[in-house]
Swiss-Prot record:
PANTHER family the record matches: ADIPOR/PROGESTIN RECEPTOR-RELATED, MEMBRANE PROGESTIN RECEPTOR DELTA
InterPro entries per the UniProt record, alphabetical: AdipoR/HlyIII-related
UniProt source species: Mus musculus
GO cellular component, one term: plasma membrane
Name used for this protein in its record: Membrane progestin receptor delta
Membrane topology: Multi-pass membrane protein
Length: 343
């Protein structure tokens, strides 16, 4: 009879430095877990369990939205193509994150590679956002401007920059954690700021009363999305509350869990806001020439996927060539001072 035993959990001083999370003192999985152990650990309360489920369940929600909206009649209308393109990476990024958090304890190398793929999925999501924004959310005065025409191609280039910087940020993480964190934060903040330029401009136009905005009036869901994005960025960078009370939020309530929740809520509100723009502006946009047709959309997506996979492969190859004893793959024991702090 098959008997499954839940993996043993470790404290921070029992795992290599590469696995440490600031302010998280317990609930670590064995750093040489098997794939089965990793899957089983998702049903055990560890410091990663909530991280896994807060992105696994939303994956199915966004997939349901994609299937519901992607009915044959809806899919046949070219006007709806940018929305469907957006939903593809909206399904991908939480799934990639879920897998990264599940299998990151197999080895130091596996941990880095898992997060390389996670970062690549987020970069593609940033590109996916650009398609509906270019199609439905551009300010009226920007329509067919040079910025409008280059918006999606620039977002594709931004995805390469995002993947490259975020993957690179893992290499100096142990020696220069502050620099690594700043680099990774900037890698994701820049594509977000670029993608949302149309919304920021419309918000400026409408500040003080939507009655004067005309076609540039914003849905309240745009505001909720931007608020969730702001909270996500703050939680990702600040590492609160666990940084103020190490060990108190190891299993429930630490910043990465809250970051996941804010991120998926932001994506939900973003989808609702895009649907609102798509519906309210359709009569006006229907007479405008689309910036990208089916062929250009497929080509842009294909090149972006190939380019991001190439970047991930390059960093993975560099990682695999590193000798086993290097600090990035081994780390060192926790200093006595930190051991005393956790007691």
């Amino acid at each position: 009879m098959l008997s499954l035993k839940m993996p043993q959990l470790l404290r921070v001083h029992q795992v290599p430095r590469v696995f440490w999370e600031e302010g998280i003192m317990s609930g670590y999985r064995c750093p040489t877990s098997s794939a089965l152990d990793c899957v089983l650990s998702s049903f055990q309360m560890t410091n990663e369990t909530v991280n896994i489920w807060t992105h696994f369940l939303p994956t199915w929600y966004f997939l349901w939205r994609l299937l519901a909206l992607g009915s044959p009649g809806f899919r046949a209308d070219p006007y709806h193509l940018p929305l469907l393109v957006f939903l593809l990476p909206a399904c991908l990024y939480p799934f990639a994150s879920c897998c990264a958090h599940t299998f990151s304890s197999m080895s130091p190398r596996a941990r880095h590679i898992c997060y390389f793929l996670d970062y690549g999925a987020l970069s593609l999501y940033s590109l996916g956002c650009a398609f509906p924004y270019a199609a439905y959310s551009m300010p009226a005065s920007w329509l067919h401007s040079r910025l409008h025409q280059l918006f999606v191609p620039a977002a594709a280039l931004n995805s390469f920059l995002c993947t490259g910087l975020s993957c690179y940020s893992r290499f100096p993480e142990l020696e220069y954690p502050g620099f690594s964190k700043a680099l990774r934060t900037a890698a994701f903040a820049y594509p977000f700021l670029f993608d949302n330029l149309p919304l920021f401009y419309r918000l400026r136009l409408c500040w003080g009363g939507a009655h004067s905005c005309g076609r540039d009036a914003l849905s309240s869901n745009h505001g909720y999305h931007l608020l969730c994005a702001l909270l996500s960025g703050f939680l990702f960078a600040a590492r609160l509350p666990e940084r103020l009370a190490p060990g108190r939020f190891d299993y429930i309530g630490h910043s990465h869990q809250l970051f996941h929740i804010c991120a998926v809520l932001g994506t939900h509100f973003q989808l609702e806001a895009v649907l609102a723009d798509m519906g309210s502006r359709r009569a006006w946009l229907a007479v405008q020439e689309p910036t990208l047709g089916l062929g250009a959309t497929v080509a842009t997506l294909s090149l972006a996927v190939i380019g991001n996979l190439f970047i991930i492969a390059a960093f993975t190859a560099s990682l695999l060539r590193m000798p086993g004893p290097c600090p990035l793959l081994q780390g060192s024991p926790l200093e006595e001072g930190l051991q005393a702090k956790q007691q």
